[in-house]
Amino acid sequence: MKILVDENMPYAEELFRRLGDVQAVPGRPIPRDALVDADALMVRSVTKVNEALLHGTSIGFVGTATAGTDHVDDTWLRQQGIGFSAAPGCNAIAVVEYVFSALMMMAERDGFQLRDKTVGIIGVGNVGSRLNARLQALGVRTLLCDPPRADRGDNEAFWPLEKLVREADVLTFHTPLNKTGAYQSLHMADDELLAALPDGRILINACRGAVVDNAALLRALEKGKKLSVVLDVWEPEPDLSLPLLARVDIGTPHIAGYTLEGKARGTTQVFEAFSQHLGQPQSVELASLLPVPEFSHLRLNGELDEGKLKRLMHLVYDVRRDDAPLRHVAGLPGEFDRLRKHYQERREWSSLCVQCDDATSAGLLQQLGFTTQLL
Protein backbone atom coordinates (compact mmCIF):
# COMPACT_ATOMS: atom_id res chain seq x y z
CA MET A 1 0.00 0.00 0.00
CA LYS A 2 1.31 3.44 -0.98
CA ILE A 3 0.41 6.35 1.28
CA LEU A 4 1.16 9.96 0.29
CA VAL A 5 1.60 12.41 3.16
CA ASP A 6 2.13 16.16 3.14
CA GLU A 7 5.80 16.78 3.89
CA ASN A 8 4.83 19.32 6.56
CA MET A 9 2.70 16.94 8.64
CA PRO A 10 4.80 16.23 11.73
CA TYR A 11 5.22 12.57 12.68
CA ALA A 12 3.31 11.47 9.55
CA GLU A 13 6.06 9.31 8.09
CA GLU A 14 6.75 7.74 11.48
CA LEU A 15 3.10 6.85 12.07
CA PHE A 16 1.82 5.92 8.61
CA ARG A 17 4.81 3.65 8.03
CA ARG A 18 3.03 1.25 10.38
CA LEU A 19 0.33 0.85 7.72
CA GLY A 20 2.20 0.89 4.41
CA ASP A 21 4.87 2.51 2.25
CA VAL A 22 5.02 6.26 2.80
CA GLN A 23 6.05 9.01 0.39
CA ALA A 24 6.26 12.62 1.62
CA VAL A 25 5.25 15.20 -1.01
CA PRO A 26 4.73 18.98 -1.14
CA GLY A 27 1.15 20.01 -0.48
CA ARG A 28 1.01 22.78 -3.08
CA PRO A 29 1.13 21.37 -5.69
CA ILE A 30 1.07 17.59 -5.21
CA PRO A 31 3.02 15.90 -8.04
CA ARG A 32 0.64 14.11 -10.39
CA ASP A 33 3.01 11.20 -10.95
CA ALA A 34 3.03 10.46 -7.22
CA LEU A 35 -0.78 10.35 -7.10
CA VAL A 36 -1.39 7.93 -9.95
CA ASP A 37 -0.54 4.71 -8.10
CA ALA A 38 -1.17 5.86 -4.52
CA ASP A 39 -3.81 4.26 -2.30
CA ALA A 40 -4.24 7.01 0.30
CA LEU A 41 -3.57 10.74 0.54
CA MET A 42 -3.00 12.77 3.72
CA VAL A 43 -3.13 16.55 3.26
CA ARG A 44 -3.32 19.92 4.98
CA SER A 45 -5.41 22.96 4.09
CA VAL A 46 -3.08 24.07 1.26
CA THR A 47 -4.17 21.15 -0.94
CA LYS A 48 -7.42 21.40 -2.90
CA VAL A 49 -8.83 17.87 -2.97
CA ASN A 50 -11.39 17.40 -5.72
CA GLU A 51 -12.11 15.58 -8.97
CA ALA A 52 -9.45 17.55 -10.83
CA LEU A 53 -6.78 16.29 -8.42
CA LEU A 54 -7.87 12.68 -8.00
CA HIS A 55 -9.55 11.70 -11.28
CA GLY A 56 -7.82 8.68 -12.78
CA THR A 57 -5.95 7.77 -9.59
CA SER A 58 -6.37 4.77 -7.29
CA ILE A 59 -6.81 6.86 -4.14
CA GLY A 60 -9.27 5.11 -1.82
CA PHE A 61 -8.92 7.28 1.29
CA VAL A 62 -8.24 10.96 1.96
CA GLY A 63 -7.35 12.39 5.34
CA THR A 64 -6.88 16.07 6.16
CA ALA A 65 -4.92 16.89 9.30
CA THR A 66 -7.01 20.03 9.75
CA ALA A 67 -10.20 21.00 11.52
CA GLY A 68 -11.61 22.83 8.48
CA THR A 69 -12.65 20.94 5.36
CA ASP A 70 -13.58 23.63 2.83
CA HIS A 71 -10.51 22.65 0.76
CA VAL A 72 -11.97 19.16 0.27
CA ASP A 73 -14.86 18.26 -2.04
CA ASP A 74 -16.22 15.64 0.34
CA THR A 75 -19.41 15.27 -1.71
CA TRP A 76 -17.40 14.09 -4.72
CA LEU A 77 -15.31 11.78 -2.51
CA ARG A 78 -18.48 10.22 -1.13
CA GLN A 79 -19.91 9.74 -4.62
CA GLN A 80 -16.72 7.94 -5.66
CA GLY A 81 -16.71 5.73 -2.58
CA ILE A 82 -13.48 7.30 -1.32
CA GLY A 83 -13.09 7.26 2.46
CA PHE A 84 -12.54 10.60 4.15
CA SER A 85 -11.62 11.88 7.59
CA ALA A 86 -10.71 15.27 9.03
CA ALA A 87 -9.29 16.24 12.43
CA PRO A 88 -11.95 18.37 14.14
CA GLY A 89 -10.65 20.35 17.08
CA CYS A 90 -7.02 19.38 16.53
CA ASN A 91 -5.74 22.96 16.56
CA ALA A 92 -8.49 24.58 18.62
CA ILE A 93 -6.26 25.21 21.64
CA ALA A 94 -3.58 26.76 19.43
CA VAL A 95 -6.06 29.18 17.85
CA VAL A 96 -7.43 30.16 21.26
CA GLU A 97 -3.92 30.93 22.48
CA TYR A 98 -3.22 32.95 19.32
CA VAL A 99 -6.30 35.09 20.02
CA PHE A 100 -5.26 35.60 23.63
CA SER A 101 -1.76 36.63 22.57
CA ALA A 102 -3.18 39.19 20.15
CA LEU A 103 -5.58 40.59 22.75
CA MET A 104 -2.87 40.80 25.40
CA MET A 105 -0.58 42.61 22.95
CA MET A 106 -3.30 45.17 22.25
CA ALA A 107 -4.10 45.53 25.95
CA GLU A 108 -0.44 46.33 26.60
CA ARG A 109 -0.22 48.73 23.64
CA ASP A 110 -3.50 50.55 24.26
CA GLY A 111 -3.48 50.47 28.06
CA PHE A 112 -6.62 48.49 28.85
CA GLN A 113 -7.42 45.45 30.96
CA LEU A 114 -8.88 42.50 29.08
CA ARG A 115 -11.29 41.94 31.98
CA ASP A 116 -12.89 45.30 31.17
CA LYS A 117 -13.77 44.32 27.60
CA THR A 118 -16.76 42.49 26.14
CA VAL A 119 -15.72 39.84 23.61
CA GLY A 120 -18.14 38.72 20.90
CA ILE A 121 -17.42 35.19 19.66
CA ILE A 122 -18.92 34.36 16.27
CA GLY A 123 -18.94 30.58 15.86
CA VAL A 124 -19.03 28.54 19.05
CA GLY A 125 -17.65 25.19 17.95
CA ASN A 126 -14.35 23.60 18.93
CA VAL A 127 -12.45 26.90 18.95
CA GLY A 128 -15.19 29.29 20.03
CA SER A 129 -16.34 27.17 22.96
CA ARG A 130 -12.80 26.83 24.31
CA LEU A 131 -12.16 30.54 23.87
CA ASN A 132 -15.39 31.32 25.70
CA ALA A 133 -14.47 29.05 28.63
CA ARG A 134 -11.01 30.59 29.04
CA LEU A 135 -12.25 34.16 28.76
CA GLN A 136 -14.95 33.49 31.34
CA ALA A 137 -12.37 31.92 33.67
CA LEU A 138 -10.53 35.23 33.46
CA GLY A 139 -13.70 37.17 34.26
CA VAL A 140 -14.24 38.57 30.75
CA ARG A 141 -17.82 39.13 29.60
CA THR A 142 -18.55 37.18 26.42
CA LEU A 143 -21.37 37.30 23.87
CA LEU A 144 -21.96 34.26 21.69
CA CYS A 145 -23.28 34.10 18.13
CA ASP A 146 -23.90 30.71 16.51
CA PRO A 147 -27.09 30.54 14.39
CA PRO A 148 -26.95 26.76 13.73
CA ARG A 149 -26.69 26.01 17.44
CA ALA A 150 -29.32 28.61 18.29
CA ASP A 151 -31.73 27.01 15.82
CA ARG A 152 -31.08 23.59 17.37
CA GLY A 153 -32.12 24.98 20.73
CA ASP A 154 -28.74 24.49 22.40
CA ASN A 155 -28.64 25.62 26.00
CA GLU A 156 -26.70 28.87 25.50
CA ALA A 157 -27.71 32.52 25.36
CA PHE A 158 -26.93 33.25 21.72
CA TRP A 159 -26.99 36.78 20.28
CA PRO A 160 -28.03 37.81 16.76
CA LEU A 161 -24.98 39.02 14.85
CA GLU A 162 -26.38 42.50 14.19
CA LYS A 163 -26.98 43.03 17.93
CA LEU A 164 -23.65 41.57 18.99
CA VAL A 165 -21.80 43.89 16.60
CA ARG A 166 -23.15 46.93 18.43
CA GLU A 167 -22.47 45.56 21.92
CA ALA A 168 -19.07 43.86 21.79
CA ASP A 169 -15.68 45.58 22.06
CA VAL A 170 -14.01 42.65 20.30
CA LEU A 171 -15.34 40.55 17.40
CA THR A 172 -13.52 37.28 16.85
CA PHE A 173 -14.60 34.90 14.07
CA HIS A 174 -14.42 31.12 14.44
CA THR A 175 -16.86 29.77 11.87
CA PRO A 176 -16.44 27.28 9.04
CA LEU A 177 -16.60 28.72 5.53
CA ASN A 178 -20.08 28.02 4.14
CA LYS A 179 -20.47 29.54 0.69
CA THR A 180 -24.22 28.89 0.37
CA GLY A 181 -27.23 27.84 2.39
CA ALA A 182 -29.07 29.06 5.45
CA TYR A 183 -25.84 29.44 7.42
CA GLN A 184 -23.70 31.09 4.77
CA SER A 185 -20.56 32.56 6.30
CA LEU A 186 -18.90 33.75 3.08
CA HIS A 187 -18.32 37.50 3.55
CA MET A 188 -20.13 37.46 6.88
CA ALA A 189 -18.16 40.61 7.71
CA ASP A 190 -19.19 42.68 4.69
CA ASP A 191 -19.66 46.39 3.96
CA GLU A 192 -22.89 46.48 5.96
CA LEU A 193 -21.47 44.81 9.07
CA LEU A 194 -18.31 46.91 9.01
CA ALA A 195 -20.38 50.09 8.70
CA ALA A 196 -22.42 49.05 11.74
CA LEU A 197 -19.32 48.34 13.81
CA PRO A 198 -18.57 51.32 16.10
CA ASP A 199 -15.13 52.91 15.93
CA GLY A 200 -12.54 51.67 18.39
CA ARG A 201 -13.48 48.00 18.12
CA ILE A 202 -11.12 45.05 17.63
CA LEU A 203 -11.77 42.61 14.77
CA ILE A 204 -10.02 39.22 14.68
CA ASN A 205 -10.24 36.60 11.95
CA ALA A 206 -8.44 33.32 12.57
CA CYS A 207 -10.84 30.92 10.83
CA ARG A 208 -11.13 31.28 7.04
CA GLY A 209 -10.07 34.31 5.01
CA ALA A 210 -13.29 34.78 3.06
CA VAL A 211 -15.44 34.97 6.21
CA VAL A 212 -14.29 38.59 6.25
CA ASP A 213 -14.71 40.38 2.91
CA ASN A 214 -11.12 41.59 2.56
CA ALA A 215 -11.99 44.14 -0.13
CA ALA A 216 -14.75 45.59 2.06
CA LEU A 217 -12.42 45.72 5.06
CA LEU A 218 -9.77 47.55 3.06
CA ARG A 219 -12.38 50.05 1.80
CA ALA A 220 -13.54 50.71 5.36
CA LEU A 221 -10.01 51.25 6.66
CA GLU A 222 -9.07 53.48 3.72
CA LYS A 223 -12.13 55.63 4.43
CA GLY A 224 -10.97 56.18 8.00
CA LYS A 225 -12.80 53.47 9.93
CA LYS A 226 -11.06 53.22 13.30
CA LEU A 227 -10.63 49.51 13.93
CA SER A 228 -7.84 47.40 15.36
CA VAL A 229 -7.57 44.40 13.04
CA VAL A 230 -5.92 41.01 13.49
CA LEU A 231 -5.84 38.77 10.41
CA ASP A 232 -4.28 35.33 10.32
CA VAL A 233 -6.26 34.30 7.25
CA TRP A 234 -6.66 36.14 3.97
CA GLU A 235 -8.73 36.37 0.81
CA PRO A 236 -7.18 34.91 -1.23
CA GLU A 237 -4.21 32.88 -0.04
CA PRO A 238 -1.34 32.87 -0.65
CA ASP A 239 -1.74 36.10 -2.67
CA LEU A 240 -2.95 38.36 0.12
CA SER A 241 -3.72 42.05 -0.33
CA LEU A 242 -0.58 44.08 0.39
CA PRO A 243 -2.55 47.32 0.98
CA LEU A 244 -4.67 45.48 3.56
CA LEU A 245 -1.63 43.99 5.27
CA ALA A 246 -0.19 47.49 5.57
CA ARG A 247 -3.30 48.65 7.45
CA VAL A 248 -3.92 45.79 9.88
CA ASP A 249 -2.45 45.80 13.38
CA ILE A 250 -1.39 42.15 13.29
CA GLY A 251 -0.97 40.10 10.13
CA THR A 252 0.23 36.52 10.13
CA PRO A 253 0.49 33.78 7.45
CA HIS A 254 -2.34 31.40 8.46
CA ILE A 255 -0.46 29.96 11.41
CA ALA A 256 -2.87 30.50 14.32
CA GLY A 257 -3.29 26.74 14.68
CA TYR A 258 0.37 25.92 14.13
CA THR A 259 1.49 24.65 17.52
CA LEU A 260 3.50 21.46 17.58
CA GLU A 261 0.74 19.93 19.72
CA GLY A 262 -1.97 21.02 17.28
CA LYS A 263 -0.15 19.66 14.25
CA ALA A 264 0.59 16.39 16.04
CA ARG A 265 -3.08 16.03 17.05
CA GLY A 266 -4.10 16.47 13.42
CA THR A 267 -1.68 13.79 12.26
CA THR A 268 -2.66 11.33 14.98
CA GLN A 269 -6.39 11.85 14.39
CA VAL A 270 -6.21 11.05 10.67
CA PHE A 271 -3.80 8.18 11.35
CA GLU A 272 -6.26 6.63 13.79
CA ALA A 273 -9.15 7.18 11.34
CA PHE A 274 -7.23 5.56 8.48
CA SER A 275 -6.21 2.59 10.60
CA GLN A 276 -9.88 2.16 11.52
CA HIS A 277 -10.80 2.40 7.82
CA LEU A 278 -8.38 -0.44 7.09
CA GLY A 279 -9.77 -2.58 9.88
CA GLN A 280 -6.47 -2.30 11.78
CA PRO A 281 -7.43 0.17 14.55
CA GLN A 282 -4.47 1.75 16.31
CA SER A 283 -4.30 4.54 18.88
CA VAL A 284 -1.47 6.97 19.59
CA GLU A 285 -0.52 8.66 22.85
CA LEU A 286 0.23 12.28 21.88
CA ALA A 287 2.70 12.81 24.72
CA SER A 288 4.85 9.95 23.42
CA LEU A 289 5.56 11.93 20.24
CA LEU A 290 6.27 15.39 21.65
CA PRO A 291 9.76 16.48 22.71
CA VAL A 292 10.45 18.05 26.09
CA PRO A 293 10.21 21.84 25.60
CA GLU A 294 13.37 23.87 25.94
CA PHE A 295 11.74 25.97 28.66
CA SER A 296 9.38 23.86 30.76
CA HIS A 297 9.23 25.20 34.34
CA LEU A 298 8.78 28.61 35.94
CA ARG A 299 8.06 29.75 39.50
CA LEU A 300 5.35 32.34 40.15
CA ASN A 301 5.40 34.07 43.52
CA GLY A 302 2.27 35.71 44.91
CA GLU A 303 -1.06 36.39 43.28
CA LEU A 304 -1.56 36.33 39.53
CA ASP A 305 -2.55 39.66 37.98
CA GLU A 306 -3.17 40.45 34.31
CA GLY A 307 0.33 41.83 33.84
CA LYS A 308 1.93 38.61 35.09
CA LEU A 309 -0.50 36.57 33.02
CA LYS A 310 0.41 38.50 29.87
CA ARG A 311 4.10 37.84 30.49
CA LEU A 312 3.45 34.12 31.01
CA MET A 313 1.41 33.88 27.83
CA HIS A 314 3.95 35.76 25.77
CA LEU A 315 6.79 33.74 27.24
CA VAL A 316 5.28 30.71 25.51
CA TYR A 317 3.97 32.54 22.42
CA ASP A 318 3.98 36.20 21.36
CA VAL A 319 2.04 36.83 18.14
CA ARG A 320 4.41 39.64 17.17
CA ARG A 321 7.06 37.09 16.27
CA ASP A 322 4.87 36.04 13.31
CA ASP A 323 3.74 39.50 12.23
CA ALA A 324 7.15 40.94 11.36
CA PRO A 325 8.34 38.11 9.06
CA LEU A 326 5.18 38.30 6.94
CA ARG A 327 5.52 42.06 6.45
CA HIS A 328 9.16 41.60 5.48
CA VAL A 329 8.51 39.16 2.62
CA ALA A 330 4.86 39.75 1.63
CA GLY A 331 4.45 40.00 -2.12
CA LEU A 332 7.51 37.91 -2.94
CA PRO A 333 6.61 34.73 -4.86
CA GLY A 334 6.33 31.65 -2.66
CA GLU A 335 7.20 33.42 0.59
CA PHE A 336 3.76 33.02 2.23
CA ASP A 337 4.01 29.25 1.86
CA ARG A 338 7.68 29.25 2.83
CA LEU A 339 6.88 30.93 6.16
CA ARG A 340 4.35 28.20 6.86
CA LYS A 341 6.59 25.37 5.71
CA HIS A 342 9.56 26.51 7.79
CA TYR A 343 7.54 27.72 10.75
CA GLN A 344 9.50 28.11 13.97
CA GLU A 345 8.48 25.53 16.55
CA ARG A 346 5.70 26.82 18.79
CA ARG A 347 4.31 25.12 21.88
CA GLU A 348 1.05 25.44 23.78
CA TRP A 349 0.68 26.84 27.28
CA SER A 350 0.34 23.32 28.65
CA SER A 351 4.04 22.77 27.85
CA LEU A 352 4.94 25.22 30.63
CA CYS A 353 4.61 24.05 34.23
CA VAL A 354 4.06 27.06 36.49
CA GLN A 355 5.00 26.41 40.11
CA CYS A 356 2.75 28.56 42.31
CA ASP A 357 2.69 29.38 46.01
CA ASP A 358 -0.87 30.72 45.71
CA ALA A 359 -3.69 28.17 45.27
CA THR A 360 -6.09 30.60 43.61
CA SER A 361 -3.51 31.57 41.00
CA ALA A 362 -2.68 27.92 40.34
CA GLY A 363 -6.37 27.14 39.84
CA LEU A 364 -6.85 29.99 37.37
CA LEU A 365 -3.74 29.07 35.37
CA GLN A 366 -4.96 25.48 35.17
CA GLN A 367 -8.34 26.67 33.86
CA LEU A 368 -6.51 28.69 31.21
CA GLY A 369 -4.54 25.66 30.05
CA PHE A 370 -1.18 25.91 31.81
CA THR A 371 0.28 22.98 33.70
CA THR A 372 0.60 23.94 37.37
CA GLN A 373 2.27 22.73 40.54
CA LEU A 374 1.29 24.09 43.95
CA LEU A 375 4.28 24.66 46.22
UniProtKB/Swiss-Prot annotation:
One example GO MF annotation: NAD binding
Keywords: Cytoplasm, NAD, Oxidoreductase, Pyridoxine biosynthesis
EC number assigned by the record: 1.1.1.290
Binding residue positions for substrate: S45, T66, Y258
CDD domains reported in the protein's UniProt record: ErythrP_dh
Gene3D superfamilies for the chain: 3.30.1370.170, NAD(P)-binding Rossmann-like Domain
Reactions this protein catalyses: 4-phospho-D-erythronate + NAD(+) = (R)-3-hydroxy-2-oxo-4-phosphooxybutanoate + NADH + H(+)
Keyword Cytoplasm: yes
Binding, NAD(+): D146, T175, D232, G257
Active site: R208, E237, H254 (proton donor)
Function according to Swiss-Prot or TrEMBL: Catalyzes the oxidation of erythronate-4-phosphate to 3-hydroxy-2-oxo-4-phosphonooxybutanoate.
Protein name (Swiss-Prot/TrEMBL): Erythronate-4-phosphate dehydrogenase
Species assigned in the record: Yersinia pestis
Lineage: Bacteria, Pseudomonadati, Pseudomonadota, Gammaproteobacteria, Enterobacterales
Gene: pdxB
